[in-house]
Design a protein with these regions (language model features):
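Extracellular glycan-modifying ectodomains
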Residues: 1-403
Length: 403
């Protein structure tokens, strides 16, 4: 009897493996993983070198893991168990609290002197960029916007790091260096605090700030430009010039997706509507596309991602308006320190934004009404943009960049 049981178990195990392998090979494949927000592995290139080094076998293992049959339901089941059975505080690199989903953080391996040295380098780079922008007749303002884990710093469990010391030291060092270099600098942290630090200014489930946060950032930046350069830029007032409305669709923020949609899907995204239509043309990577700033879904039940705004991350977007009250084109650019988001502002239209951000990647965008807190990246601190209203530098690792 024991021998029969052993044979039965071996046959059952072999049968399950055979079914899984057959299903993995035969079922339709999708290169994109929605919940992980990444492309799955491609079939590796087989060369004598990759075979001898063993790399091809590692790549094949990754490939089979990525395309394993019923992989998504299995991941969802494991995530559900971690959330509801084991009640882990950190699941899939996401800190789970009652009110907000935050990234799992680690203290950077940087000394205080390293932080100050980086701040000095960034300030020097931005001072040179400001001088270049002003030589074109433009206007420059560096806006530091708190990213999500800074905005919800107090929501992080006490037994996990929230980088508060690093954030405080970095911001104070950057502020001091920017002021010493004469850079027009705006810290949105105190501005948000003066407005009551409402949760709608920053997403609770994503590393982006909300449309109202973008609106208040733009208001403060316009005022900073007016004060610094003696301008008279106008601003669309809520109620009179612009109204916000929430879309009924469920919102799948990046951290919600990390949790397979099992937590944090009650947040709603906003859109802005202006009292007066402002005609504009849009160019993505210098190719003209449809004049739209929202990638609206077909139905109210379709889940939204942050790609609602501008259709997602695009290397370069330029929006040109012909608004009669627009001042002559002039420019400004910003970047941000590590836990703060970049928010470059252009003064070329009544309501335009130019975005930049993370070190090691480079892009730019100019956005005009309707307001969109879109995202893009900027150049490394050792590079300088030769074009006004494009990119600036950030000393950050992953968290820099406008949301």
């Amino acid at each position: 009897m024991k021998r029969i049981c052993e044979w039965a178990m071996a046959l059952l195990f072999s049968g399950v493996l055979l079914v899984l392998m057959a299903a993995t090979i035969l079922l339709p494949k999708n290169r994109y993983s929605y919940y992980e927000n990444r492309n799955l592995s491609a079939f590796p290139e087989i060369t004598p070198e990759s075979v001898l080094s063993g790399q091809v076998f590692d790549d094949l293992e990754t490939l089979f893991c990525d395309y394993a049959a019923w992989r998504t339901p299995a991941l969802k089941a494991v995530t559900w168990a971690d959330l509801n059975v084991f009640r882990r505080p950190v699941v899939n690199e996401t800190v789970v609290t009652d009110d907000v989903l935050l990234p799992q953080l680690y203290d950077p391996a940087m000394s205080d002197d390293d932080i100050r040295a980086q701040a000095n380098l960034v300030a020097e780079d931005n001072a040179a960029l400001q001088k270049q922008v002003e030589s074109y007749g433009g206007h420059y303002c560096y806006v530091a916007v708190p990213c999500q884990y800074v905005y919800y710093e107090d929501s992080s469990p006490a037994y996990l790091t929230n980088r508060s010391r690093y954030t405080d030291l970095e911001l104070s060092a950057l502020t001091e260096e920017m002021n010493a270099q004469g850079v027009c600098f705006l810290d949105m942290g105190p501005v948000f605090d003066s407005l009551g630090h409402p949760p709608e200014f920053s997403s609770r489930v994503d590393n982006h700030y909300g449309l109202r946060g973008a609106y208040e950032t733009y208001r403060a930046a316009v005022q900073a430009l007016n004060d610094a350069y003696g301008l008279a830029l106008s601003f669309p007032e809520e109620g009179a010039d612009v109204t916000f409305s929430a879309l009924p669709n469920p919102y799948m923020g990046s951290r919600t997706r990390k949790l397979m949609g099992l937590r944090g899907n009650d947040e709603k995204l906003l859109t802005a509507a202006f009292r007066e239509d402002i005609p504009f043309t849009r160019l993505d990577n210098w190719q003209e596309v449809a004049s739209a700033v929202y990638a609206l879904p077909a139905t109210e039940d379709e889940a939204l991602t942050y790609g609602l705004y501008m259709g997602g991350d695009i290397a370069e977007t330029c929006i040109r308006t012909t608004a009669p009250r627009s001042p002559p084109p002039s420019s400004s650019v910003t970047a941000s320190p590590t836990p703060w988001r970049a928010s470059p502002i252009t003064a070329s239209t009544r309501c335009a934004l130019s975005t930049c951000g993370t070190i090691r990647r480079r892009a730019s965008a100019t956005i005009s009404p309707p307001i969109s807190p879109t995202s893009s990246s900027a150049s490394a601190i050792t590079r300088r943009s030769s074009r006004a209203a494009t990119t600036a530098a950030s000393p950050d690792f992953k968290q820099g960049g406008l949301l």
